[in-house]
């Protein structure tokens, strides 16, 4: 493709459970199948030299799912990290994790820290795995940090603007997403990157995540390329 490409893509990987249930399989089989789609999309981003890919792996609301499913997801995440980290590193991928790590197991937290440390200097692609995250949590946490900076005398109230506030978000240092993709037919962002998606192009597809392949990714990119991003301004044709 010769058309313009997004540099940061954020994805809500929805429909693993529904994919499995539609095939008469346990929901956990859908989560396993979803890992294959993750690998495919990472490879697509590498081929197209996209700078950053954010994957919404587990939201703060997902704790309300059945305990057995939550435990399986955490074990699957840990296992995938251990299994794939060397390959990700060899391909020049830098791993980052966004979200509240405190409720996660110490073993998982250490694996995340080690993965970030190992890949810190890689530059081919930033793979931002979003775990135990909520957009409201991110904004509230950022506000608390900002207040402490003001009280500590490190920041004056008059210095606070949107750019300064963004530095206190958990995504600090990353560009805001150009393209948001959500699979499985849900038409909402579900408390994901509430601040960061202000001017992001939204793309929704009925395809469940395990069926989201290279062709489906191309369709999303084609849709993005056809859009005129105005950022609140008037386009040149108007």
Curated annotation (Swiss-Prot):
<dbReference type="InterPro" id="IPR036424">
    <property type="entry name" value="UPP_synth-like_sf"/>
</dbReference>
<feature type="binding site">
    <location>
        <position position="31"/>
    </location>
    <ligand>
        <name>substrate</name>
    </ligand>
</feature>
<keyword id="KW-0460">Magnesium</keyword>
<dbReference type="InterPro" id="IPR018520">
    <property type="entry name" value="UPP_synth-like_CS"/>
</dbReference>
<feature type="binding site">
    <location>
        <begin position="59"/>
        <end position="61"/>
    </location>
    <ligand>
        <name>substrate</name>
    </ligand>
</feature>
<dbReference type="GO" id="GO:0000287">
    <property type="term" value="F:magnesium ion binding"/>
</dbReference>
<dbReference type="InterPro" id="IPR001441">
    <property type="entry name" value="UPP_synth-like"/>
</dbReference>
<comment type="similarity">
    <text>Belongs to the UPP synthase family.</text>
</comment>
<feature type="active site">
    <location>
        <position position="14"/>
    </location>
</feature>
<feature type="binding site">
    <location>
        <position position="65"/>
    </location>
    <ligand>
        <name>substrate</name>
    </ligand>
</feature>
<dbReference type="GO" id="GO:0009252">
    <property type="term" value="P:peptidoglycan biosynthetic process"/>
</dbReference>
<keyword id="KW-0479">Metal-binding</keyword>
<feature type="binding site">
    <location>
        <position position="182"/>
    </location>
    <ligand>
        <name>substrate</name>
    </ligand>
</feature>
<feature type="binding site">
    <location>
        <position position="19"/>
    </location>
    <ligand>
        <name>substrate</name>
    </ligand>
</feature>
<keyword id="KW-0961">Cell wall biogenesis/degradation</keyword>
<feature type="binding site">
    <location>
        <begin position="15"/>
        <end position="18"/>
    </location>
    <ligand>
        <name>substrate</name>
    </ligand>
</feature>
<keyword id="KW-0808">Transferase</keyword>
<feature type="binding site">
    <location>
        <position position="14"/>
    </location>
    <ligand>
        <name>Mg(2+)</name>
    </ligand>
</feature>
<dbReference type="Pfam" id="PF01255">
    <property type="entry name" value="Prenyltransf"/>
</dbReference>
<dbReference type="GO" id="GO:0005829">
    <property type="term" value="C:cytosol"/>
</dbReference>
<keyword id="KW-0573">Peptidoglycan synthesis</keyword>
<dbReference type="GO" id="GO:0016094">
    <property type="term" value="P:polyprenol biosynthetic process"/>
</dbReference>
<feature type="active site" description="Proton acceptor">
    <location>
        <position position="62"/>
    </location>
</feature>
<feature type="binding site">
    <location>
        <begin position="188"/>
        <end position="190"/>
    </location>
    <ligand>
        <name>substrate</name>
    </ligand>
</feature>
<feature type="binding site">
    <location>
        <position position="63"/>
    </location>
    <ligand>
        <name>substrate</name>
    </ligand>
</feature>
<feature type="binding site">
    <location>
        <position position="27"/>
    </location>
    <ligand>
        <name>substrate</name>
    </ligand>
</feature>
<protein>
    <recommendedName>
        <fullName>Ditrans,polycis-undecaprenyl-diphosphate synthase ((2E,6E)-farnesyl-diphosphate specific)</fullName>
        <ecNumber>2.5.1.31</ecNumber>
    </recommendedName>
</protein>
<dbReference type="GO" id="GO:0071555">
    <property type="term" value="P:cell wall organization"/>
</dbReference>
<comment type="function">
    <text>Catalyzes the sequential condensation of isopentenyl diphosphate (IPP) with (2E,6E)-farnesyl diphosphate (E,E-FPP) to yield (2Z,6Z,10Z,14Z,18Z,22Z,26Z,30Z,34E,38E)-undecaprenyl diphosphate (di-trans,octa-cis-UPP). UPP is the precursor of glycosyl carrier lipid in the biosynthesis of bacterial cell wall polysaccharide components such as peptidoglycan and lipopolysaccharide.</text>
</comment>
<keyword id="KW-0133">Cell shape</keyword>
<dbReference type="GO" id="GO:0008360">
    <property type="term" value="P:regulation of cell shape"/>
</dbReference>
<dbReference type="GO" id="GO:0008834">
    <property type="term" value="F:ditrans,polycis-undecaprenyl-diphosphate synthase [(2E,6E)-farnesyl-diphosphate specific] activity"/>
</dbReference>
<feature type="binding site">
    <location>
        <position position="201"/>
    </location>
    <ligand>
        <name>Mg(2+)</name>
    </ligand>
</feature>
<comment type="subunit">
    <text>Homodimer.</text>
</comment>
């Amino acid at each position: 493709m010769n058309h313009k490409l997004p540099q940061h893509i954020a994805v809500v990987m929805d429909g693993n459970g529904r994919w499995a249930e539609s095939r008469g399989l346990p929901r956990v089989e859908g989560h396993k199948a979803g890992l294959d789609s993750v690998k495919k999309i990472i490879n697509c981003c590498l081929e197209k030299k996209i700078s950053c890919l954010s994957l919404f792996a587990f939201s703060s609301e997902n704790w309300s799912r059945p305990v057995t499913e939550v435990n399986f997801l955490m074990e699957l995440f840990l296992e995938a990290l251990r299994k794939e980290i060397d390959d990700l590193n060899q391909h020049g991928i830098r791993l980052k994790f966004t979200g509240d790590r405190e409720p996660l197991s110490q073993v998982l937290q250490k694996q995340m820290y080690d993965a970030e440390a190992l890949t810190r200097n890689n530059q081919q692609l930033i793979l931002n795995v979003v775990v135990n995250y909520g957009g409201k949590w991110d904004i509230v946490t950022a506000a608390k940090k900002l207040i402490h900076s003001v009280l500590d005398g490190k920041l004056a109230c008059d210095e606070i603007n949107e750019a300064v506030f963004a530095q206190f978000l958990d995504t600090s240092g990353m560009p805001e997403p150009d393209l948001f993709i959500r699979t499985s037919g849900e038409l909402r962002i579900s408390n994901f990157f509430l601040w960061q998606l202000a001017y992001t192009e939204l793309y929704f597809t009925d395809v469940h995540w395990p069926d989201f392949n290279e062709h489906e990714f191309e369709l999303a990119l084609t849709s993005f390329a056809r859009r005129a991003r105005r950022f609140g301004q008037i386009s040149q044709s108007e």
